[in-house]
C-alpha cells in the first residue's frame, strides 16, 4: 500500500512537471508572436499580471499615451480602466544614452504591474503598441505572463506610401491606412497627392487645380465608382480634411510627407492651366497609365504657381520634408521648346538633364526658405543633385549608394523589394496587379543598407519605404489586400529585427496575426499558403513540379480540370505533361483546403518540349524560363510579363525550332501583346520558314501589319502541309514608337509567348 502511494506521488509530480513545461512553452510561444519582434525579450518565471477586473493606468510623464492606452484597453477588455497619476500600469521617462537606439523603451511585466519606461513620446507610443499586442494574445487566459522587453528602432525612417491620384481614397480610408501603419510601429506616411490622373489637394489660390484637375473621364476600371462628379471620376481633400488627417497621424506618431510632383507627372495640373506647358495644350486629365511627354515648362508662370502651391502646402503639413517627385520627366517637349532651349543657353546649362536639375534646385531653394527640405525620386540625381536634397532610391539601390557617398541622406524603396502594387502570389489566383511579383519572403529579405557603403556612409541611409501605386487598385479593400501581410515584413525590416535565419519564425507569426486581421475584417492575401508550379524538361519529356513553403501541408491535384478535394491524388513527384490538360492543385491541412487552387493549362503541339535557338537574346528583365518558354505548352498572361513571355526591346524574335525529326505540319500559332501605354506594340510582320538541314530555309508563309492588327493578339499562319525537321519563326518588332505616343522615338517592346506548330 505504501509502495503504491509512492508510485502515485511520483506520477503526479511528473504530470505537474509536464504541465508546467507545457504552460511555460505556451507562454514563450505566445510572447513571440509580436510583430515587429522586439530587439530583446526575456520571459520570466515570476507569475503574471491579471487583466480581469477594473484596471488603473498611471499617466506619469506620458499623459497622452496613458489616455490612449486606457481607451484601447477598455475597448479590448470591455472593462473599466481608470486614469490616475499613478497605478499598477505606469509610465516613466528615461534618458536614451545610445544615439543608434532610436525611440528606446523598456516594458516590464510582473504580478505587481506593468512598467513602461520610454525615452520619447513616440517611444512610449511604441511600448503601448507592444503591450496591446500582448494583451490581445493573452486575453483568453486573463493575464499576461511576466516578461521584460528592451526595444528600439534601427531606422529613423520607417515609411509607407499611398498613391491617391491614380485612384482616389477618402480621408477616412487614409486614416485606416494610418491605423495599420501605427500598429506595426511605422512612422512615416508618404501621401502621393498629385499626378497625371488627378490633383487631390485643395489649393485656394488656384482653384482650377481641383475644379478641373481632380476629375477625369470615367473608364472601365471606375465605371461603378461612387466617386463621381458630373459624370467624371475623382475627388480631392479640402484643406480642413487634410488638417484633420495630419492631426490624426500626429496622435499615432506618424509624420505625413506630402508629394507635389514636378516637373513631370503634371497632366492633371496642365489640364487646369495649359499655359504652364511647352505647347499650350489643350489637355485632359490622364485616363491611361504610363509616362506622359507633356510636363511643366520651366517658365516664370510655372514657378509662380508652384511657389503658391508650396506656400499653402507648408501651412498644412508640419513635416520637415516636402516630396517634389522629380521622376519620369521626359525631355521630349523641352528639346523642341524655344523657351527651354533659350533657358539652357541663358543659364549656361549643358542639356535638358541639367535643365531639370535647375528646375529642382530652384524649387528646393524656395522650399528651404520655408524651413523645409526636399525629397525626390532618384532621377533628381540627373544633371546634378540639389544641395540639401534627400534621395528616394526606387529604380534600384544605386541611387541611394550614390547619394550616401556624396554625403546626402537616402530612403531606400527599390522596385525589386518595396513595390506593393506587384503580385504577391501566382497571377492566375491573385487580383489584377502591376506586371511583376513581390512575395512576402522577398520583402522580408531586404536590407536597406547596401554593402557597398562604409559605416560613415551608411549613416545617411534613413530607412526603408514601401510604395502602394494604385493604377490597378480601385478600392480600399484592394489596398488592404496588397498591404497585408507584406506590411508585416516591412515593419520588421524597418524596425531592424529581420534576420534571414528567422524567416520561418516570422512566417509563423504572420499566420498567427491572420486571426487579428480576421477579427478586424481586414482583407489580406493568403498567398503564403499557395503552391508554386515549375515546368521542367527531362530527357525530352515535360513535367510540372509543385512546391509549397508550408511543408507540413499535403498537396493534392487533378489532371482533368476538376477542383482538387481530400480524395484527389497526393502529389509525390513531378506530374508528366504528355497531352493537353489542366492541372489543378492545392494545399490541404487535414481535411481542409488552405489557400487557393493553382490552375495551369497545358496546350500541347508538335513543337512542345523541343529545342529552340534564338538569334537575339531577350531583354534580361523578361527572359522567363529562357527558350523553353516558347515551347512549354503554356500561354502567357497578358497582365504579367515576368513569366511565360519573352520580351525584346528594339530586337526581333528569330527562333529556330529543332523538331528532333522530320514531322508534318501546316499551322504555326503565336501570341503577342499590344499595350502602348507600356511601350509594347504588335509586330510589323511574322514569317515562317522550314528547313531539313538548319542551313537552307524556305519561306512558307508571312503576314503583315494589317492582319496582325486584326488578330487580337493571337497570330495564326496556315500554309500547305510541310514535312521538315526545322521551323524558323521571324517576328519583326516595330522599329520606333510613333510620334504622339508615350516614348515616341524609342525602340518598341515586343512580347511573344508560345510558338505552337500543328
Question: Which residues fall in each region the model found?
Answer:
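Bacterial Sec-dependent N-terminal signal peptides
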Residues: 1-33
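Acidic, contiguous N-terminal accessory segments
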Residues: 28-158, 368-377, 381, 385, ...
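Feature activates predominantly on carbohydrate-active enzymes
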Residues: 98-321, 362, 366, 465-469
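Surface-exposed loop/turn motifs at beta-strand-loop junctions within extracellular Ig-like
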Residues: 120, 587-591, 733-735
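Active-site neighborhood of glycoside hydrolase catalytic domains
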Residues: 269, 274, 286-287, 292-387, ...
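Flexible, acidic glycine-rich loops studded with aromatic residues
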Residues: 373-379, 384-389, 395-543
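Short, compositionally stereotyped local motifs that mark structural "simplifiers"
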Residues: 497, 501-656, 673, 682
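Aromatic, loop-rich ligand-recognition surfaces of beta-strand-rich domains
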Residues: 638-701, 708-758
Amino acid at each position: 500500500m505504501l509502495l503504491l502511494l509512492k508510485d502515485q506521488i511520483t506520477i503526479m509530480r511528473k504530470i505537474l512537471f509536464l504541465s508546467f513545461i507545457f504552460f511555460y512553452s505556451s507562454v514563450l510561444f505566445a510572447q513571440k508572436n509580436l510583430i515587429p519582434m522586439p530587439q530583446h525579450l526575456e520571459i520570466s518565471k515570476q507569475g503574471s499580471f491579471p487583466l480581469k477586473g477594473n484596471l488603473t493606468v498611471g499617466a506619469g510623464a506620458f499623459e497622452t499615451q496613458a489616455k490612449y492606452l486606457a481607451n484601447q484597453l477598455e475597448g479590448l477588455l470591455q472593462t473599466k480602466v481608470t486614469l490616475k497619476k499613478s497605478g499598477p500600469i505606469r509610465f516613466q521617462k528615461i534618458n536614451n544614452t545610445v544615439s543608434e537606439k532610436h525611440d528606446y523603451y523598456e516594458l516590464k511585466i510582473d504580478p505587481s504591474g506593468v512598467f513602461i519606461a520610454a525615452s520619447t513620446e513616440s517611444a512610449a507610443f511604441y511600448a503601448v503598441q507592444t503591450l496591446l499586442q500582448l494583451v490581445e494574445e493573452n486575453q483568453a487566459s486573463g493575464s499576461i505572463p511576466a516578461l521584460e522587453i528592451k526595444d528600439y528602432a534601427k531606422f529613423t525612417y520607417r515609411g509607407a506610401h499611398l498613391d491617391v491620384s491614380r485612384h482616389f481614397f477618402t480621408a477616412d480610408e487614409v486614416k485606416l491606412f494610418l491605423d495599420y501603419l501605427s500598429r506595426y510601429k511605422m512612422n512615416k506616411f508618404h501621401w502621393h497627392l498629385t499626378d497625371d490622373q488627378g490633383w487631390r489637394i485643395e489649393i485656394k489660390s488656384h482653384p482650377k487645380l481641383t475644379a478641373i484637375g481632380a476629375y477625369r473621364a470615367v473608364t472601365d476600371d471606375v465605371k461603378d465608382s461612387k466617386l463621381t462628379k458630373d459624370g467624371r471620376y475623382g475627388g480631392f481633400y479640402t484643406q480642413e480634411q487634410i488638417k484633420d488627417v495630419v492631426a490624426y497621424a500626429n496622435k499615432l506618431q506618424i509624420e505625413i510627407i506630402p508629394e507635389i510632383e514636378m516637373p513631370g507627372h503634371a497632366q492633371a495640373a496642365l489640364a487646369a492651366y495649359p499655359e504652364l506647358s511647352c505647347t499650350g495644350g489643350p489637355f485632359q486629365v490622364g485616363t491611361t497609365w504610363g509616362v506622359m511627354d507633356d510636363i511643366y515648362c520651366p517658365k516664370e508662370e510655372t514657378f509662380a504657381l508652384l511657389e503658391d502651391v508650396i506656400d499653402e502646402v507648408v501651412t498644412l503639413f508640419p513635416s520637415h520634408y516636402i516630396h517634389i517627385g522629380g521622376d519620369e520627366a521626359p525631355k521630349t517637349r523641352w528639346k523642341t521648346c524655344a523657351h527651354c532651349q533659350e533657358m539652357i543657353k541663358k543659364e549656361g546649362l549643358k542639356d535638358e538633364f541639367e535643365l531639370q536639375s535647375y528646375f529642382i534646385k530652384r524649387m528646393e531653394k524656395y522650399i528651404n526658405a520655408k524651413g523645409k527640405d526636399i525629397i525626390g525620386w532618384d532621377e533628381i540625381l540627373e544633371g546634378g543633385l540639389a544641395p540639401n536634397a534627400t534621395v528616394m532610391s526606387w529604380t534600384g539601390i544605386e541611387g541611394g549608394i550614390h547619394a550616401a557617398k556624396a554625403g546626402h541622406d537616402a530612403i531606400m524603396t527599390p522596385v525589386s523589394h518595396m513595390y506593393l502594387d506587384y503580385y504577391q502570389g501566382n497571377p492566375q489566383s491573385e487580383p489584377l496587379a502591376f506586371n511583376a511579383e513581390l512575395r512576402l519572403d522577398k520583402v522580408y529579405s531586404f536590407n536597406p543598407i547596401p554593402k557597398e557603403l562604409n559605416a560613415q556612409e551608411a549613416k545617411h541611409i534613413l530607412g526603408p519605404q514601401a510604395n502602394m501605386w494604385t493604377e490597378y487598385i480601385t478600392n480600399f479593400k484592394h489596398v488592404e489586400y496588397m498591404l497585408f501581410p507584406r506590411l508585416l515584413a516591412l515593419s520588421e525590416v524597418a524596425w531592424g529585427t529581420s534576420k534571414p535565419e528567422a524567416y520561418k519564425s516570422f512566417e509563423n507569426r504572420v499566420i498567427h496575426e491572420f486571426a487579428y486581421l480576421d477579427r478586424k475584417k481586414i482583407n489580406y492575401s493568403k498567398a503564403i499558403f499557395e503552391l508554386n508550379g515549375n515546368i521542367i524538361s527531362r530527357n525530352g519529356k515535360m513535367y510540372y513540379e509543385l512546391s509549397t513553403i508550408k511543408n507540413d501541408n499535403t498537396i493534392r491535384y487533378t489532371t482533368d480540370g476538376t477542383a482538387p478535394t481530400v480524395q484527389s491524388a497526393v502529389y509525390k513527384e513531378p506530374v508528366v505533361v504528355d497531352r493537353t490538360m489542366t492541372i489543378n492543385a492545392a494545399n490541404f491541412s487535414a481535411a481542409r483546403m488552405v489557400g487557393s487552387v493553382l490552375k495551369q493549362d497545358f496546350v500541347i503541339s508538335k513543337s512542345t518540349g523541343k529545342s529552340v535557338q534564338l538569334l537575339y537574346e531577350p531583354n534580361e528583365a523578361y527572359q522567363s524560363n529562357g527558350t523553353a518558354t516558347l515551347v512549354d505548352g503554356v500561354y502567357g498572361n497578358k497582365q504579367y510579363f515576368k513569366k511565360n513571355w519573352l520580351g525584346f526591346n528594339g530586337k526581333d524574335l528569330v527562333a529556330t525550332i529543332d523538331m528532333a525529326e522530320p514531322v508534318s505540319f501546316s499551322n504555326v500559332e503565336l501570341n503577342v501583346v499590344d499595350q502602348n501605354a507600356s511601350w509594347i506594340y504588335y509586330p510589323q510582320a511574322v514569317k515562317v520558314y522550314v528547313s531539313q538541314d538548319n542551313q537552307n530555309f524556305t519561306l512558307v508563309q508571312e503576314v503583315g501589319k494589317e492582319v496582325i492588327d486584326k488578330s487580337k493578339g493571337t497570330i495564326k499562319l496556315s500554309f500547305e502541309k510541310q514535312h521538315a525537321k526545322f521551323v524558323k519563326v521571324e517576328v519583326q518588332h516595330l522599329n520606333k514608337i510613333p510620334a504622339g505616343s508615350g516614348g515616341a522615338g524609342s525602340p518598341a517592346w515586343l512580347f511573344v509567348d508560345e510558338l505552337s506548330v500543328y
